[in-house]
Amino acid sequence: MMTQMNYTGKVKRVAIIANGKYQSKRVASKLFSVFKDDPDFYLSKKNPDIVISIGGDGMLLSAFHMYEKELDKVRFVGIHTGHLGFYTDYRDFEVDKLIDNLRKDKGEQISYPILKVAITLDDGRVVKARALNEATVKRIEKTMVADVIINHVKFESFRGDGISVSTPTGSTAYNKSLGGAVLHPTIEALQLTEISSLNNRVFRTLGSSIIIPKKDKIELVPKRLGIYTISIDNKTYQLKNVTKVEYFIDDEKIHFVSSPSHTSFWERVKDAFIGETDS
């Protein structure tokens, strides 16, 4: 969905976030040298209007988590300096085009849904997180056994390696490698995908991905105490004695700078997984 922030002539605060690769540092250096003397821009990692991520999707995920509490004020734009990045609009040789587009920028943005996760521990503590791609739960040892509850109704008893819940844009990441569907981000929904479920005459699960609309809630209730591996995008945590994991579509969204260079979702999917096709 395209909307617009109010940028009537104000100086844009820009944060530049880059990974440690030589090419990324070179691009960052060029951007710094241009913006530091430009009266229309102010370089600052504090309270930025625009965050420029230089690297790939991993760097964009890191930038998202750096500013996940400021999503209502921040727009992102990505430059990829290696393999094609799903979230990035510019290649490293298109820096001048990016600078020109930012000078012409009127505050237009493309917005995508994100995931909100609430993890309840056996002592009553609740750990909350946001994910741009997906959140997964796995058991460190033995098979994971958990009830899957949708809108307070027990849907199935899961036995297997784990569960992944992804956003529409995240549907092209780990979810796709698990055999999940690719979901367009204008569909505000979550996708639940099983990780190596056990299915036999005794234990049965649906065995296919489930698309959950925004108004619905997913709950995962582990039936065994122990250590669980919780992955939120590119961050992994080990938590002991998880009693419940809840998943929602967040009220906030991630916003990307909209410009003539913004690549449509299906173009990104084609470029990432199919490449050039015969005419």
From Swiss-Prot:
InterPro entries attached to this UniProt entry: ATP-NAD_kinase_N (IPR017438), ATP-NAD_kinase_PpnK-typ_C (IPR017437), NAD/diacylglycerol_kinase_sf (IPR016064), NADK (IPR002504)
Gene3D superfamilies given in the database record: Probable inorganic polyphosphate/atp-NAD kinase, domain 1, Probable inorganic polyphosphate/atp-NAD kinase, domain 2
Any one Gene Ontology BP term: NADP biosynthetic process
GO cellular component: cytoplasm
Pfam families tied to this protein: NAD_kinase, NAD_kinase_C
Binding residues annotated for NAD(+), in chain numbering: D57, G58, N133, E134, R159, D161, T172, A173, Y174, N175, K176, S177
Cell compartments where the protein resides: Cytoplasm
EC number: 2.7.1.23
Cofactor(s) annotated in UniProt: a divalent metal cation
Residue positions of the active site: D57 (proton acceptor)
UniProt KW Kinase keyword: yes
Record-level Gene Ontology MF annotations: ATP binding; metal ion binding; NAD binding; NAD+ kinase activity
Catalytic reaction(s) noted: NAD(+) + ATP = ADP + NADP(+) + H(+)
Keyword annotations of the record: ATP-binding, Cytoplasm, Kinase, NAD, NADP, Nucleotide-binding, Transferase
SUPFAM superfamilies noted in UniProt: NAD kinase/diacylglycerol kinase-like
Family: Belongs to the NAD kinase family.
NCBIfam families xrefs: PRK04885.1 (NF003424)
Functional note: Involved in the regulation of the intracellular balance of NAD and NADP, and is a key enzyme in the biosynthesis of NADP. Catalyzes specifically the phosphorylation on 2'-hydroxyl of the adenosine moiety of NAD to yield NADP.
Name of the featured protein: NAD kinase
Gene: nadK
